[in-house]
């Protein structure tokens, strides 16, 4: 699963997920899956969506993952009293903002790509839309 190789600090504050995304265009492939709402997407969810797409296109074409889980989420163990510091890192998330491009694909028929994106979107906790590349 995706996670940073090394970070400056082990734990991070919760923070807020506000604003709009900057990576909102289809940059690498022909068609992209774009987030419509905001969420915290875990590394497991990203991997699950990637596997669903890869299996549907039968390992043809090329898939780009445009999000990376770089924020650690901590959790204290069960039945532990409050206090005594912050819990250990449980999993990693990517903070998704509206308009962010999640996945891109090319090299396969458009109908198959749309079906693959539909399978991937079912595994994600965010509403999505499919965007085609516009050539200027």
Swiss-Prot record:
Keywords: Ribonucleoprotein, Ribosomal protein, RNA-binding, rRNA-binding, tRNA-binding. GO terms for molecular function: rRNA binding; structural constituent of ribosome; tRNA binding. InterPro entries: Ribosomal_uL16, Ribosomal_uL16_bact-type, Ribosomal_uL16_CS, Ribosomal_uL16_dom, Ribosomal_uL16_sf. It comes from the Bacteria. Pfam families: Ribosomal_L16. CDD domains: Ribosomal_L16_L10e. Belongs to the universal ribosomal protein uL16 family. Binds 23S rRNA and is also seen to make contacts with the A and possibly P site tRNAs. Part of the 50S ribosomal subunit. This is Large ribosomal subunit protein uL16. It comes from Ruthia magnifica subsp. Calyptogena magnifica.
């Amino acid at each position: 699963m995706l996670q940073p190789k090394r970070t400056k600090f082990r734990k991070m504050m919760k923070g807020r997920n506000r604003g709009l995304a900057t990576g909102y265009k289809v940059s690498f492939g022909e068609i992209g899956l774009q987030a419509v709402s905001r969420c915290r997407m875990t590394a497991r969810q990203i991997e699950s969506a990637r596997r669903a797409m890869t299996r549907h296109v039968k390992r043809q074409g090329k898939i780009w993952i445009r999000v990376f889980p770089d924020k650690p989420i901590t959790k204290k163990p069960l039945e532990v009293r409050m206090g005594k510091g912050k819990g250990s890192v449980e999993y990693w998330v990517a903070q998704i903002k509206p308009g962010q491009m999640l996945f891109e694909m090319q090299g396969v028929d458009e109908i198959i790509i749309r079906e693959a994106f539909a399978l991937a979107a079912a595994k994600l906790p965010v509403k999505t839309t499919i965007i085609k590349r516009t050539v200027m």
